[in-house]
Amino acid sequence: MPNKTFHFISGLPRSGSTLLGAILRQNPRFSAGMSSPIANLVEGVVNQVSAGSELSRMVDGPQRERILKGLFDSYYADNSAEVVFDTNRGWTARISEMATLHPKAKIICCVRNVAWVMDSLERQFRGKAFENTGLFPNASERATVYTRTEALAASNRLVGFAYQALREACWGEHADRIMIVDYDILVSRPAEVLGLIYNFVGEPHFEHDFEQVSYDAPAFDEQLGLDGLHRVRPKVEVSSRKTILPPDVFEKYVQLAFWQDLKDCAAFRIVAKAAEQAD
């Protein structure tokens, strides 16, 4: 199997990672899409061979690295793409492993104001009135918008984990591998954003059709008790709406967009505050 080039997509949920994957996959040289299981498989293998397990003395460092590289090779063996963008929110928390396994890899981190992330997830929840979605495991978490948003913001949950992992990566030793892409700029200026992404990953530019973008994963969404979680509308455009969150809940999360004012951070940023410079 010819060597593939690997890059990664991560960041916050409901912030354009599936949309970005749907756009990138228009390029016949690229493979991209919704979250893959690779990051979870890497974590599982590391857990199995780490100190405290009976396998730790049987698998040395070089063997571990070869096994983990083999996960990528095996998972993408039937994929003919030259360049793979593997998506998972966990990559920002495992960026050291990523850098060791794929020294030239870059990571595109999609972000969005956290208040609007919560708004989007709340809309998903309310869209299935007679379904207990997989987002919340018990009645106490599902009870109200207050308990739902608080649960999602926990450090080991959908929004909180991704947010904290991104903060860690932005000030880590591999921050120069990161490009932060604000959802609002992606949907309002997609051609410019994609051009910057191509420059960042060092690939020749490709002319994308932002009027005919498509992606859907109904089987995956159905197992979560949700509808359209990974459905991408054909046209990339701004869609304005009024929030359905109570004002106090919205205000609680609207101030958390730390990427708009990053100091001493080596990450490349395409964010709202500096949209004209894409600094």
Q: What are these regions, as identified by a protein language model?
A:
Residues 1-7, 152-155, 163, 167-173, ...:
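PAPS-dependent sulfotransferases, especially Golgi type II membrane carbohydrate sulfotransferases
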Residues 1-71, 78, 126-128, 220, ...:
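PAPS-dependent sulfotransferase catalytic core
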Residues 9-11, 84-87, 109-111, 180-182:
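Short beta-strand segments
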Residues 16-30, 98-102, 180-205:
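PAPS/PAP-binding and catalytic site of the sulfotransferase fold
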Residues 18-21, 40-42, 92-95, 115-120, ...:
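Short catalytic/ligand-binding loop motif for oxyanion handling, primarily in non-cytosolic enzymes
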Residues 62-78, 119-200:
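PAPS-dependent sulfotransferase catalytic domain
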Residues 71-97:
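Glycine-rich phosphate-binding loop used to anchor ATP phosphates in small-molecule kinases
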Residues 87, 98-124:
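Conserved phosphate-donor/acceptor-positioning beta-strand/loop module used by diverse small-molecule
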